[in-house]
């Protein structure tokens, strides 16, 4: 054991490790999307990225990789390479926009090549109430009117965090479970994952409310989870 003291912090966007006064991003990633292209507009910091079936939503975080920009944008590959961007708009299922820190100096319709590493989405920043179909009693109010009932709430993005010795167990509320090995070599350069060596969770339930480690038997317990593993529709 190295004796390092790590603090895990889960937010609505990131999973972080606090160590010696610094925050280290260990947020798990979804599958990499390759062969995306980029478009820019002269005088605007908005960049449009095209990738079919990207399945990204507004607010998602995506890291860009293997960036080769088309000529004429005024940007350098390094302005995008290994950088995180938030999805600003999603015009279509094949396009989304991000914002650079400076304006492009040229208009390029689309071109270049880059890979996308989407962060695992966690959830909204704050709890909100749900208004709409299915809220309040059936037949209450007039057709088309929004319900004013407050008994339905939409939860913020939450994490369930526990440890199995040196290994962090991190579960997104109603989502997947990931692990991060604090005892591994160069641990702070590694991300939480479902395939962490010797602590894999890729065969675990994919939708659980909470996970905890039994202090007596050292079993990992999933609560409010799926009755059929890998079928989120069976979460009970």
Where are these regions (language model features)?
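Short beta-strand elements that form the blades of beta-propeller/WD-repeat-like
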Residues: 4-10, 16, 166-171, 218-228
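Beta-propeller domains
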Residues: 5-30, 178-184, 231-236
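Elongated alpha-helical scaffolds
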Residues: 10, 153-177
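Hydrophobic or amphipathic alpha-helical targeting/insertion segments
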Residues: 16, 24-25, 86, 166-180, ...
């Amino acid at each position: 054991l190295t004796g390092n003291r790590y603090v895990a912090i889960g937010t609505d966007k990131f999973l972080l490790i606090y160590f010696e006064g610094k925050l280290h991003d260990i947020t798990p990633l979804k599958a990499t999307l390759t062969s995306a292209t980029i478009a820019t507009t002269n005088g605007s910091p908005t960049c449009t990225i095209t990738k079919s079936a990207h399945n990204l939503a507004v607010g998602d975080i995506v890291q860009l990789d293997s960036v080769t920009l088309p000529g004429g944008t005024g940007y350098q590959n390094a302005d995008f390479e290994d950088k995180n961007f938030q999805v600003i708009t999603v015009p279509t299922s094949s396009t989304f926009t991000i914002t650079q820190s400076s304006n492009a100096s040229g208009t390029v319709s689309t071109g270049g090549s880059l890979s996308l590493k989407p962060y695992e989405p966690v959830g909204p920043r704050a709890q909100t109430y749900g208004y709409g179909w299915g809220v309040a009693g059936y037949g209450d109010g007039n057709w088309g009117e929004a319900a004013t009932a407050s008994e339905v709430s939409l939860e913020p993005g939450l994490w369930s965090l526990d440890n199995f010795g040196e290994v962090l167990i991190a579960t997104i509320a109603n989502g997947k479970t990931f692990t991060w090995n604090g005892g591994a070599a160069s641990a702070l350069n590694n991300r939480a994952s479902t395939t962490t060596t010797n602590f894999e969770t890729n065969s675990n339930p994919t939708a659980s409310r909470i996970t905890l480690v039994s202090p007596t038997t050292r079993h990992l317990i999933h609560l409010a989870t799926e009755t059929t593993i890998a079928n989120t529709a069976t979460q009970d």
